Amino acid sequence: MATKCGKCGPGYPSPLEAMKGPREELVYLPCIYRNTGTEAPDYLATVDVNPKSPQYSQVIHRLPMPNLKDELHHSGWNTCSSCFGDSTKSRTKLLLPSLISSRVYVVDVATEPRAPKLHKVVEPEEIHAKCDLSYLHTSHCLASGEVMISALGDPRGNGKGGFVLLDGETFEVKGTWEQPGGAAPMGYDFWYQPRHNVMISTEWAAPNVLRDGFNPADVEAGLYGQHLYVWDWQRHERVQTLTLQDGLIPLEIRFLHNPAADQGFVGCALGSNIQRFYKNQGGTWSVEKVIQVPPKKVKGWILPEMPSLITDILLSLDDRFLYFSNWLHGDLRQYDISDPKRPRLVGQIFLGGSIVKGGPVQVLEDQELKCQPEPLVVKGKRVAGGPQMIQLSLDGTRLYVTTSLYSAWDKQFYPDLIREGSVMLQIDVDTVRGGLKLNPNFLVDFGKEPLGPALAHELRYPGGDCSSDIWL
């Protein structure tokens, strides 16, 4: 196992070896103040998740960024399991690309894991000048030792799905990963699978469209994404565009963790479905819808029909289970994907959402539920918002969940989330029969933060997790 290997690099030799890794004791997650009314910088929170610790389920450290209104969002590592064979590499820095300001913060989490400190700031001017890219999202480490970050647009806020390359040691901006002029029309997330010489990227919308909130008219105008882009991994060129039937706003994308696998899943937020992409015999790629969450007919909401809004998806390291969150409907789901063409629902839990009893929304017609779910109260705190970002323990038995999506959309869809702050919850997972159960003893209430209620987002463990590492 990698942790006992004197000559190995970061992470684990395989996803199945990673499942035997140590239990997580810390979680790092960005907390956002943009759009909350609190004039304070976003910060990286460190949460103690060791049940034996006296500080269990508490924020034990906060690292504020030096600027206001960055909109920290996702994070990634300087190096990970893609460099397992290189003993000169070690996972020491967490990179925090900013969705709005386009800064990249490099945080040292190795010197003192319980009290991270800022190592370097990559300013947007350098990224604009060298890449003509902006509005940064997903960060993945590469086997080359570089770090690759996806962009949603150009510095003027137009759609542009390109990729920034940073040196993994100095964090200097090296330029774009894609060939000059070869960016996709829009961008968001990406995942690569070198054994099949492929990368696939997704798209949200142009920054100018989504920055200040959601306008349904923009959907009608075709301004939101519904494509996957297939790239030649070695040539850095876009080779195929897949149009997603019913697949509006494809966000998070996950190949199966097995590096030999030639298929994976993407969650389509507004389409409220999961689509499977796969390689054909001729080497091209196709996509098919495998799960559809039906909308609910409602009264008292901005539209007469409420989509579930699938905002995050995750695969267990053994590729047995798919998890996803329905941010508006309020449920988190577990599917058995032993047969990836026919996912089977085996677990479901409601964690707030827009259709709870006693709320402003009345459900008129529901293809799935007989009655509206009860509001979620944990340790006396009524949970605002719905389940959003998720992270799974390496062994697959614990899910961590946060409730904020993106500050401008939080403000629009869940105003109480802005007033009361988001939460972090922990769900126990049955990996034998399937099933999800809330841990009633775990709650991190970001409504009680020292500077005011904060919006906590993506979750990371110090040693890598189920969405940070890619195996070769």
Curated annotation (Swiss-Prot):
Query: From the record, what ranges are coiled-coil?
Result: none
Name by which UniProt lists this protein: Methanethiol oxidase
Q: What organism does the UniProt record list as the source?
A: Bos taurus (Bovine)
Can you tell which superkingdom this protein's organism belongs to?
Eukaryota
| GO cellular component labels | cytosol; membrane; nucleus
Q: How does it sit in the membrane?
A: Peripheral membrane protein
GO BP annotations of the record are: protein transport
**Biological pathway:** Organosulfur degradation
Ordered alphabetically, the record's keywords are: Acetylation, Cytoplasm, Membrane, Nucleus, Oxidoreductase, Phosphoprotein, Protein transport, Selenium, Transport
**Which GO molecular function annotations are given, in alphabetical order?**
methanethiol oxidase activity; selenium binding
Q: What class of enzyme is it?
A: oxidoreductase
Assembly information from the UniProt record:
Interacts with USP33.
* Main location class: nucleus
Q: What EC number is given for this enzyme?
A: 1.8.3.4
In terms of InterPro entries, this protein maps to: Se-bd (IPR008826)
Q: Is Transport given among the entry's keywords?
A: yes
Q: Which Pfam families match?
A: SBP56
UniProt keyword Cytoplasm, yes or no: yes
Subcellular location(s): the record lists: Nucleus; Cytoplasm, Cytosol; Membrane
Q: Which reaction does it catalyse?
A: methanethiol + O2 + H2O = hydrogen sulfide + formaldehyde + H2O2 + H(+)
Q: Which residues carry this modification: N-acetylalanine?
A: A2
What happens to this protein after translation, modification-wise? The N-terminus is blocked.
State the family it belongs to. Answer: Belongs to the selenium-binding protein family.
Sum up the protein's function in the record's words: Catalyzes the oxidation of methanethiol, an organosulfur compound known to be produced in substantial amounts by gut bacteria. Selenium-binding protein which may be involved in the sensing of reactive xenobiotics in the cytoplasm. May be involved in intra-Golgi protein transport.
